[in-house]
Design a protein with these regions (language model features):
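S-adenosyl-L-methionine
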Residues: 96, 102-149
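A short glycine-rich, Lys/Arg-flanked "PGG" loop and its adjoining helix->strand segment in the class I
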Residues: 160-176
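Class I SAM-dependent methyltransferase Rossmann-like catalytic core
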Residues: 2-68
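Glycine-rich helix-loop-beta junction characteristic of Rossmann-like nucleotide cofactor-binding loops
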Residues: 61-67, 133-134, 172-173
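Short glycine-dipeptide loop
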Residues: 93-96, 174-179
Length: 232
């Protein structure tokens, strides 16, 4: 593996990982990408759980989603990058806001946040989330993505299905005027999701944060001004 150093122009040299005999080429590409990603390095420096934290930071800077005292749900929260940012910005745990993270996987504790393990689609788990919030949610976040299959059309359909389920949950817990943010992949199958969001929210916009990798098809739908669940 090449060492990171400084050239004559003080520009950092790229780190390059060689192809180990037992390592798949895709794994080597992932390692090279991680080692040369400035958001990965900055997340490590700041103590964020993942580089995804910067995506929420950038979305918040653009859309002003997080405010002190808010009640926030983070669906699919593990490892906790978005939950960290939300808890810090709403003042969770300081007798003000409340942030509840839920995931099928366990996540290490985050100061000020309540982390639950389970499936938000399960009625009993949904009730646990409501109880932990202590009232209607102001914001529901979803950075969820199903494991990639390598087939773009399949991955698109799977993430749209997750976003639709997250929307259904949000419609059940949001207060009037609340907001919903979810990751989707571009691909054309999100028409029904967007139609439902436009009925339920005053504003529906798309954004791709700078922290999203350029080659990724991911984008985020930002819906604000919740008016109530769309009519069947």
């Amino acid at each position: 593996m090449a060492r990171r150093g400084q050239g004559s122009g003080s520009r950092p040299l790229a780190v390059k990982v060689g192809h180990a005999r037992r390592r798949k080429p895709s794994s080597t590409e992932w390692l090279n990408r991680q080692l040369n990603d400035p958001f990965v390095a900055e997340a490590h420096r700041l103590g964020y759980r993942s580089r995804a934290a910067f995506k929420l930071i950038q979305l918040d800077e653009r859309f002003h989603l997080l405010r002190p005292g808010m009640r926030v749900v983070d669906l699919g929260c593990a490892p906790g990058g978005w939950t960290q940012i939300a808890a810090a910005r709403v003042g969770a745990g300081k007798n003000r806001g409340a942030v509840v993270g839920i995931d099928l996987l366990a996540a290490d504790p985050i100061p000020g946040a309540t982390l639950l393990q389970g499936d938000f689609r399960d009625l009993a788990t949904a009730e646990r989330i409501r109880a932990a919030l202590g009232g209607p949610a102001d914001l529901v976040l979803s950075d969820m993505a199903a494991p990639a299959t390598g087939h773009a059309a399949t991955d698109h359909l799977r993430i749209v299905a997750l976003a639709e389920e997250a929307f259904a949950f949000a419609a059940a817990v949001l207060r009037p005027g609340g907001a919903f943010v979810a990751k989707v992949f571009q691909g054309g199958a999100e028409g029904d999701l967007l139609a439902g969001l436009k009925k339920a929210f005053a504003s529906v916009r798309h954004a791709k944060p700078a922290a999203s990798r350029a080659e990724s098809a991911e984008t985020y739908v930002v819906a604000t001004g919740f008016r109530g669940p769309p009519a069947a």
